[in-house]
Amino acid sequence: SLVIRGEKDEQAVLCSKDKTYDMKIADTSNMLLFIPGCKTPEQLNADQASCNIIHAQIAGFSNNYWELRRCRPKLKKLRKLLMEDPYEGPESRKDQTLTFSKYTTEDLLSLIQASEEEILHELQVIDACKIEGYWRILEFDYEMKLLNHVTQLIDSESWSLSKVPLRTCLEELGSLEPTEMIEHILLSYGRKYTDDGEIYFEMHEDKICRAIARMLLQNAVKFNLSEFQEVWQQSVPEGMTTRLDQLKGLALVDKSSRPETIFLLKVEDLPEDNQERFNSLFRIREKWTEVDITPYIQDLCAEKQTVGALLTKYARCSTQNGVKVYNSRRPIS
């Protein structure tokens, strides 16, 4: 089935079960006639026994039609809605006393301009979970608290990061936090699998290192790069190795400053519109290398579109010290 989605201030989109399409009115030089019960040529050929003249009644006509073009689902609003009331844990007074908006799957389907499959996939990507029938995002400090419980248990039990037992985690940590939250954090930061009838998790090293980097950077405007790398490596669980490529789309290194610095720049905080996204990036930095800018524009690529094609359209290429760099095609205010 097809459904048109969009609020009064939004450009309507058409959604199937798994795809989203922009809708635009297109003109046609041929008049389109609306005929109830009209048969196609194929249907008429199939009924050759009766060759009668058909007197058709025209119910209406049009000189334009809706043209559909596959587009990216508009999912930024999903995170924005869920971040109105992030889940801070079962003991949070805010959760018990205040009545913030909470959203079911049906609510999100009516508010987000995307297909059902695209919305459900994005909920997985942003690590949302269902609590009492409502979709929630964990407040970051609470998320890190849960992750810390798990990594400390892994360390104290000397478990392999590739084989963390669910049952033991729930038994050991169930007195500290709800078991649903412990399992959710394992699902968010690990891959679930079964071995000899027992459920285990293989922890994602890159994702854990990335979360700890975000925690370290969130309260600093800029961080000395070498100092940050030292503190970051000391902060991750034993056996994990930190690398700057784990921070793509999360943090940006300023190699032009002395000493070199790093600061938080999350791709999800940037505008969803292509031109606005490029304007924001060129306000932050006048010239970008392709390596630096790619994590911040990759999600803008439409079906079969490349990062190179986006850069050709929205940026101007030049060479600086033998390195190809990109700056804005238009003046940035």
Indicate where each model-derived feature is located:
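C-terminal interaction modules of eukaryotic adaptor/scaffold proteins
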Residues: F282-S333
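Long Lys/Arg-rich low-complexity intrinsically disordered regions in nucleic-acid-associated proteins
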Residues: S1-Q233
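Short interface patches used for recognition in eukaryotic signaling and trafficking proteins
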Residues: T194, R210-M215, E260, Q275-S280, ...
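Short, ordered beta-strand-loop transition motifs
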Residues: I4-E10, V253-R258, C317-G322
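Low-complexity, intrinsically disordered regions in eukaryotic regulatory proteins
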Residues: K255-K287
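Noncatalytic alpha-helical scaffolds and linker/capping helices
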Residues: A220-L265, T289-E290
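Beta-strand cores of modular interaction/reader domains in eukaryotic scaffold and signaling proteins
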Residues: V13-C15, D22, E67, F263, ...
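Acidic, Ser/Thr-rich intrinsically disordered and amphipathic helical segments
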Residues: K207, E227, D273, R277, ...
